[in-house]
Amino acid sequence: MSTVAAYAAMSATEPLTKTTITRRDPGPHDVAIDIKFAGICHSDIHTVKAEWGQPNYPVVPGHEIAGVVTAVGSEVTKYRQGDRVGVGCFVDSCRECNSCTRGIEQYCKPGANFTYNSIGKDGQPTQGGYSEAIVVDENYVLRIPDVLPLDVAAPLLCAGITLYSPLRHWNAGANTRVAIIGLGGLGHMGVKLGAAMGADVTVLSQSLKKMEDGLRLGAKSYYATADPDTFRKLRGGFDLILNTVSANLDLGQYLNLLDVDGTLVELGIPEHPMAVPAFALALMRRSLAGSNIGGIAETQEMLNFCAEHGVTPEIELIEPDYINDAYERVLASDVRYRFVIDISAL
């Protein structure tokens, strides 16, 4: 066992504080990682504030982890000391169900072991990337291509794969009309990835205040949803819509933006259920779907794609003592577009 510094939430109402946690010694199949950077995800905030259920306090958040291998177990074959690696949203799964055997471990039937706020197979709570080091089974570690700087690679492990997976699953590419609802941490990755895949990307946002950013990031067009005329102009105009926001929406308005056989994919998690108008689905054979991060192989594919196409998130690098301020700014939508913690300053 080793002791490392970390930032943890002790309750739903207290700010995160600096503390120490223990990490297991690497087993035969484990990789020990010196964490260099950790992204801040809105999921971190939902979890520590107990908005998605009661956490196992203390909680060390962070599932966008980039670092360097410091040691490997005796039977590790994929990595060696000095390799640049990442860890995403989960660190283990059952490896036996039909989700795991198909490479979509995020949908593990018994439940994946998440990077934090889960109970690992050793019976101990998992703790995330707001810490100096982590030990992970090699099968749940990602290789970060050399051309990707570690700080911008970190948010790809959640924000990147959350958008890449549905874009790939619903075959976004040339001659595909894709709309991204929301231009935040997730949405800006949807624009960049969709454009890199060759899709015709449109941003749908409440106002036009980020229009310049949206077009610079690769969108072909940008519309304000606060303007009722937007929904008339764009009716039937998209093959795929990815909803990255967590606010409750009038689903009927957005479903009517889809062409025949179009799909609206929910990526955000609204606080309250939303009504689904059956006519908007049935009359044009539209679909309403959801998507959640991606499997290990697909996440590696995404990293390689980003390296090949020069796709990286736009980040604001912060020191650990700024985490609580960063949380407040995320809640105020005051970041363009992802916070990344410099763990070397921990």
Curated annotation (Swiss-Prot):
InterPro entries: ADH-like_C, ADH-like_N, ADH_Zn_CS, CAD-like, GroES-like_sf, NAD(P)-bd_dom_sf, PKS_ER. It comes from the Bacteria. Its EC number is 1.1.1.2. Belongs to the zinc-containing alcohol dehydrogenase family. Zn(2+) 2 binds at C94, C97, C100, C108. GO terms for cellular component: cytosol; peptidoglycan-based cell wall; plasma membrane. The lineage of its organism: Bacteria, Bacillati, Actinomycetota, Actinomycetes, Mycobacteriales. Zn(2+) 1 binds at C41, H63, C158. Its cofactor is Zn(2+). This is NADP-dependent alcohol dehydrogenase C.
